[in-house]
Structure formats: structure tokens, C-alpha cells
Amino acid sequence: MNKQINSVAPMSDTTSEALSVDALAADCKAAARELSTLSTETKNRTLRRMADALEADEEAILAANGKDVSAAREEGLDDALIDRLVLNPDRITKMADALRDVASFADPVGEMGGTTKRPSGIEVGKMRIPLGVIGMIYEARPNVTADAAGLCFKAGNAVLLRGGSNAFHSNQAVAAALHTALEAEGVPPAAVTLIPTTDRAAVQEMLTLNQHLDLIIPRGGEGLIRFVDETSQIPVIKHYKGVCHLYVDEDADLEVAEDLLLDGKVSRPSVCNALETLLVHADVADDFLPRARALLDDAGVELRGDDRTRQLLPGVGAATEDDYAAEYLDLTLAARVVESDDEALNHIAEYGSNHTEVIVTDRLPTARRFVRSVDASVVLVNASSRFSDGGELGLGAEIGISTTKLHAYGPMGLEALTTEKFVVYGEGETRHPVEK
């Protein structure tokens, strides 16, 4: 039986030197003070140098990744999870290009907006500023090391990274390349700090450091997210599982529905914006479900359905409550026939994870109602769930897809990694003048 990655499980592969997460976080905070005042030009130049460093260190990064992938296969990890772990030249190029994209985006730090003059004479505005130090806890996706570093850096934040045990060597190699670029530009390397251990105690200590860290962002499986949410003494933005639905309405173009089904389920099933459940209106189920089954069978997808689905598709396995709540991350799909739009919306309300939802319909009022009613950070009409991605939505590299409504919801780009402070200009105005 395949094992699941446990990012917070203790392992023996740690650095030989004594480790103080508190000291690393303190250094990270000191670096954040410098980052907050860096010019946009310096940040962009450093990001481009980071991208170049990743490509220059490709051989070392791939060698380190090979160690992690070999160990993961020996441990019997799921193919879907190994897919997230694997790096290759193309993926390294994409990591580098994502950093260059971030460099090309407008710098939100220092932006002033909404300035108004008050009756007292003062001028009140808001300035966008960095959050400070962001703690990232994530599983076997070494690309997150570069993506998180780049986005946090451009937004003026330092980042303390604790990657998954299974990506230990890969993350170290990626971070080493980034440090080369930081040092070359005279930026404190502590701005991007990777905790060099796989010991669970490091995560537990990290979650208590509210004197140094301003925000925790966990990315990974349900167990990791729950552990962080229940343990952290620092505010958490959860990047929860993606139980994404495709609803084929009675007025749907069924050829479009076929395309979105295949792209959403088959193109890369191991990612959080892949489809996990198919909902089909009863009025088109007799026509669409046999067509969908043929396509899914050809793609090697296992279909599990409710009673109506199984009546239409003999041989399909029964879907359970657990199936409808599952983030499979593999070639398995749950299906259900619904009698109305309300039934589809109710199903999503019960089993969805506030991530990504898709409707296929040619009827505009139905589309508008679905968009307004469904509780998800990204809602798509006649477009693939795979577009629920920071790059595709115009954010550049994303730090993740938040399913927490405060302080960000959906794919998190640069602006989501900043906040605002009030800035007031006056000419000596006082609220309660006192006679001298």
C-alpha cells in the first residue's frame, strides 16, 4: 500500500550543527527590515539574478532532486505525490521564468491610494507595505521554494521556509542558488531562510515564534493544514484541499463539457485545481454520461457514481460520502446526477472546499446565479478548472491558493502579501487646540 507524505514527521536527515529555529527567525526578521526599503529596481535586478542562478545551478539541483525522488520511490510514495516532487530541466526553466515574471510586475510596496482631505484640513491616505516575515510550511513541491521566495521578496517580505521531508535535498539546492543571487546583490541571505532540518520539532517551534513571524502559510495535505491551524500561535492563511467540481447544466454545450472534463481531470491530476467530482443535470445525463465514460475510460480514469449514474453506466463502482469529500489527486473521479441547479449548489456547499468550481452552461442567468451562489475562491464559467492558477489569472507566480477568506481568498500574488497603513499629512492641524 502506498504511503502518504507527512511533512511534519521526524526523519534522521538533518544538519549536524545545532539548530535554533528562533535564531533563524530572528535573522529573518532583521533582514525584513532591510527588504522593506529596497528600491523596486534593486528587487527586480535581484529577482532576475535569482532566475539566472537557478538555471546556472540546474545540474546540482537535478542531482539533489534525484536523491529525493529515489528515496520517495523506495518508500512507496503515491505516484501523484512523486509527480509534485520531480524536477526536470523544463520545470526548472519554468521556475526561473516565474521569477522573471515577478520582476516584470508592478511593485505594490509604497503605493498610495484613496487620499482624501478631511474637514480638519489633514490629508489621509493609505500606503501599501510588506507584511514582514512570512513562514511557509509546505510538502514535496520544491518549486514552492523558489516561488515563495520570489513573491515574498518582491513584496518586501522575508520568508522562513520549512519544506517537506521528502524534498529536503531539492529545497537545499534551490535555496543555495537563490542565496548566490542575494549575496551578489548585497541583500542579506537571511531574507530567504530555509530551515535545514526535517525534524518535526522545528515546525512546532516555528509555530510559536509570534515575536518574529507575522504570518504562516501552510501548503500541503489535509493533515498538515489541520496540524498547523490547530497548533500555530501566529495567524494562518490556509491553503486547503481542492475538492473541485464540474457541473454540467441542462443548457450546457456537451462538447465543451467534454473538453473541460478531460483537461480538468486528466492533464495533471495531482494538482489542487484538478477536478474531483462531476455533477450532471438529469436532463442531459442520458446523453452526456456515456460520452464522458468513454473518454474517461480511454484516459484510464476510474469513475465512481451515485445510483442514477450506475444505472446509466453499468459496471461503475458506487461512490460513498468519503468519495464526494475526497481530494483524490489521481485518476479517480466521483460523479452524481442532480435534478436541479439547487441540488448541484447544495452538493457543492456540503462537499466543496472553497477552492475552485466550474459550471458548463449556455444560459447566462444560470451562470450568473452559480457565480453568485457558489462558495469558492475561484469560479469559472465554461472554462477549465486548471485556470485556477496565479500565472493564468495574471498574478505571476503564486504563493498558493487561499481557502481562508481573511486576509486573502484565492490565488495569492504580490498584493496579497502586503497590507496597508494610514499615512496622514498636515500643516500643523491639531484636534483640540490648546491656548498657549
UniProtKB/Swiss-Prot annotation:
Drop me one GO molecular function for this one.
glutamate-5-semialdehyde dehydrogenase activity
Catalytic activity reads: L-glutamate 5-semialdehyde + phosphate + NADP(+) = L-glutamyl 5-phosphate + NADPH + H(+)
Q: Name one Pfam family in it.
A: Aldedh
Q: Which Enzyme Commission number(s) are listed?
A: 1.2.1.41
Disulfide-linked positions? none
**Keywords, ordered alphabetically:** Amino-acid biosynthesis, Cytoplasm, NADP, Oxidoreductase, Proline biosynthesis
The terms describing its cellular component in GO are:
cytoplasm
Q: What is its main location?
A: cytoplasm
Its pathway, per UniProt, is: Amino-acid biosynthesis; L-proline biosynthesis; L-glutamate 5-semialdehyde from L-glutamate: step 2/2
Organism domain of life: Bacteria
UniProt cross-references to HAMAP family, sorted A to Z? ProA
**Function per UniProt:** Catalyzes the NADPH-dependent reduction of L-glutamate 5-phosphate into L-glutamate 5-semialdehyde and phosphate. The product spontaneously undergoes cyclization to form 1-pyrroline-5-carboxylate.
NCBIfam families in the record? PRK00197.1, proA
Q: What is this protein called?
A: Gamma-glutamyl phosphate reductase
